[in-house]
Structures are given as C-alpha cells and as structure tokens.
Amino acid sequence: GSTVNHQYSKSFQFEKDFHEFSRMFLPGSAYYFSMLRPLSEFQIAGYFSSCKAYHDIFRSCNVGSKADSWCGHCPKCLFVAAILSPFLSQEELRKIWGKNLFEDESLLEILEQLTGIQEEKPFECVGSRSEVNTALYLTVSRLEREGIPLPALLACYRTTPQFEEAKKSGDVFSDYFDEENLVPEPWKALVRCRCAGEEARKRIC
C-alpha cells in the first residue's frame, strides 16, 4: 500500500524533499525552510499572543472560512482558544470570538476530545493533547490565583485526571526546541531567542 498524508505539505518530510529537489533541479533558487519547524504550537501561540495587531483579523476556522469568521462551535475554534488561553486574558479571548468559548457547555464533548478524556480525537488540524492540557492547566491555575471563577468548561476540566497529570508535569513546552529542522543560522538563534526558554515563559500571564 501507499502512505497517505493529507498534511504532507506541512510536514518536515515535505520540507526535506522539496529542499533536496530545489538543490538538484533549481540551482540558485531560494533556500526553502520553515522558520517555525523547531517550535511547538504552544510556543507559536505564545509568540502570536504578543502580535496584538493581528488578533482581530486572523482566522483558523474551517466552518467559518467562507464568511471570514470564527464559527465558535468547532474543534478548531476551541483548540485555538485553548492554546492561546495561557497568554491572553479571558476578555481578550472573548473579543476574538465574540464570546467566551469556555462558558459554552455545548463544547464540553469537544473539550474532552481535545484533552484525551474521550479516546476519539477531532478530525481537524489541532495540536497535541499534551499541549492542550498544558495550556488549560496554566489557564486554570492563573484564574484560581487571581480569584476569578472558572467558566463552565474549565471548571469541569479542573476535576479530571488530565488536569492532575498536567499539574504534575508543569510547563514542558516553553523550553522545547526541535533540532530536526533546516533553519539556517543566524535565523535559528533568533527563533530560539525570541520564542523559546525564558522569553516564552514571560508571555504566560
């Protein structure tokens, strides 16, 4: 049989294949690489949280794509809200979606799929469950520290084994840096400096 990957064009395998193709058949062409390859989605979300000018215009919702909007009801919407939540206030999240998705109890099943409470994962381009759990743990911890009542979905998540496991692990993604990449120097050093380690931790509210 043949390996099928509808996300092949986003993979490191494609990046390597096209890089080699360019070297062999397109001499003198651009050096092809992904500057985001070394980073986790958690770190990318953290960096993007500081790009305030784009918060009103970015989209990552398949359902609302034709209307250039967020539907506010799908796994993509809830994942993006979750991965951004350690870095933005609840009011900032509300402004992006027009509501606080964590207050929408109809999204509980999707939250359970994103965090691994349910075995089935959404058939959408969403990040890893470990990243979602880390993000939600940090968000719950911050809200409790600030004395802010947990919205319905986070209150439910607070009672789960997934929360307890994330609590034990803590923030395991701020220091992440995947050395399997084609990022050349000095760009690699720049990515590490701006998006990993202490700079990444500073963005957590």
Where do the PLM segments sit?
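Nucleotide-activated chemistry modules centered on ATP-dependent adenylation/adenylyltransferase
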Residues: 1-205
